[in-house]
Amino acid sequence: MSLRIYNTLSRAIEPLIPLQPGHVRMYVCGMTVYDLCHLGHARAMVAFDVVQRWLKVSGLRVTYVRNVTDIDDKIIKRALENGESIRALTERMVDALHQDADALGIERPTHEPRATEFVPQMLSLIGRLEQKGLAYQAVNGDVNYAVRKFPGYGKLSGKSLDELRAGERVAVADGKDDPLDFVLWKTAKPNEPLDAKWDSVYGQGRPGWHIECSAMCGQMLGETVDIHGGGADLQFPHHENEIAQSEGATGKPLASIWMHNGFVTRDNEKMSKSLGNFFTIRDILARYDAETTRFFIIRAHYRSALNHSDAHLDDARNSLKRLYTALDLVAPEPLLEIDWRQPFAARFKAAMDEDFGTPEAVAVMFELATEVNKTRDPKLAGLLKALGACLGLLQGDPKVFLQAGATLDAASIAALIAQRTAAKAAKNFAEADRIRQDLLARGIVLKDSAAGTVWEVVA
């Protein structure tokens, strides 16, 4: 197989060699559902949606698991603030998550396990770690992971225990043997709601965040997965802790390849609520269409930082219009399958096979669109649409996309175009130009060709 992926663990690009030939098992850490999804979530979902799409295009069977964290300190706090049950809050947020993902054209994962459905498996895993001397119960009732007893700790993030200890400025708290230790099981507190605690041999409590993913991943995909992914912010400590838990229990690698998508910034500053530059997916979709938002994410490489600004989104929409204009100009001939020997297709595939190189793949699509404009070849237009499908793009009606957001209805625009055509026929070019300029002032540009006049909306 020619597909190669950057492995965060080895810090090198490696060939993807599925442990089960022809079948890729991929686990991606999903959302903690206490609030609406933001642009960072959108980036992760789109990035791994492209991954699963390309794996399928490459002829592989994909079992894609993306979890939902539906029990967490933030969830408990928000539910109490809202005066609602944890279940009511998380159900509402999962519904919103699905609506946002559907709007962005994100295919559902094969499985979407929820943490609360796997508490017995989490307790079983904690028990195995305790038996191996990697976990202990603290005086406050919490069960913690003994980080220094796992020899491989820090291998994913490249952090040494000495570096981590030097950066630790707090005293040992809550009965931890070491400040680096992390919680596996949190003992219940008196003021917490009943739906935030489970019975266990350690007393009532709830699982820690890190043990949730280790248990769900192992239960659904086995001891070693082909790809484990998530945002760059999860690399440490979450994924480092997952490795310690899973590999500490099984003695086997948790994942063959670790993938991490890059951060999202706003005008080159880190996006955060405290800076007031934080945007939910719905904030963005209120101003930009979903396909433009998806294209904005895809045209940057998944590992690079993604800088969000109105100018970048405007540019993404105008760029996407160029592709749709080619498909509007020439009706695409449907392709039963892509001939990957075709030069444009071959270059697209080479880009995607090299660590999902979407910037290079998109560049090929623009070159192909230019060729469609020159040749008016329906087969090339069909290829452009088919390549777009590999990325979840260009599957809409070109006219609908190009004319979206018009300040006049289509019938009124058609009437003005007819008036302009009549003025040109009567050699009243001043009137024809006036109509063109009036429409342009409304954000509508006219394009004349031998086949007639068409219009589209400009940003």
Swiss-Prot record:
Annotated EC: 6.1.1.16
Motif ('KMSKS' region): 270-274
The keyword Aminoacyl-tRNA synthetase belongs to this UniProt entry's keyword annotation: yes
A Pfam family recorded for this sequence: DALR_2
Residues the entry annotates as binding Zn(2+): C29, C213, H238, E242
NCBIfam families found in the cross-reference section: cysS
Protein name from the UniProt record: Cysteine--tRNA ligase
Lineage, broadest ranks: Bacteria, Pseudomonadati, Pseudomonadota, Betaproteobacteria, Burkholderiales
Gene: cysS
